[in-house]
Amino acid sequence: MHTTRLKRVGGSVMLTVPPALLNALSLGTDNEVGMVIDNGRLIVEPYRRPQYSLAELLAQCDPNAEISAEEREWLDAPATGQEEI
């Protein structure tokens, strides 16, 4: 088990993570992690944003849904750049 000490940095408390643990989780600075308390334990784990395929995203859409006034305005607006429609 690795141990570390909580340190005050400005108005926050910092938890330093030993390099061996970062390497084991393929983490580095500026990576996002999730934190949760479970039975009195702080659990920190890598946060990976879900990756969806186009098919998965389209499966969530209702092709019969009504178009809102805002969407209709956007669809009817003239091209403003080099769009090809």
Curated annotation (Swiss-Prot):
The keyword DNA-binding applies. The keyword Nucleotide-binding does not apply. Gene3D superfamilies: 2.10.260.10. Belongs to the PemI family. GO terms for molecular function: DNA binding; toxin sequestering activity. Keywords: DNA-binding, Plasmid, Toxin-antitoxin system. Antitoxin component of a type II toxin-antitoxin (TA) system. Labile antitoxin that binds to its cognate PemK endoribonuclease toxin and neutralizes its activity. Responsible for the stable maintenance of the plasmid during cell division. Both PemI and PemK proteins bind to the promoter region of the pem operon to autoregulate their synthesis. SUPFAM superfamilies: AbrB/MazE/MraZ-like. Forms a complex with cognate toxin PemK. Transmembrane segments: none annotated. InterPro entries: Antitox_PemI-like, SpoVT-AbrB_dom, SpoVT-AbrB_sf. This is Antitoxin PemI. It comes from Escherichia coli. Signal peptide: none annotated. Residues 4-49 form the SpoVT-AbrB domain.
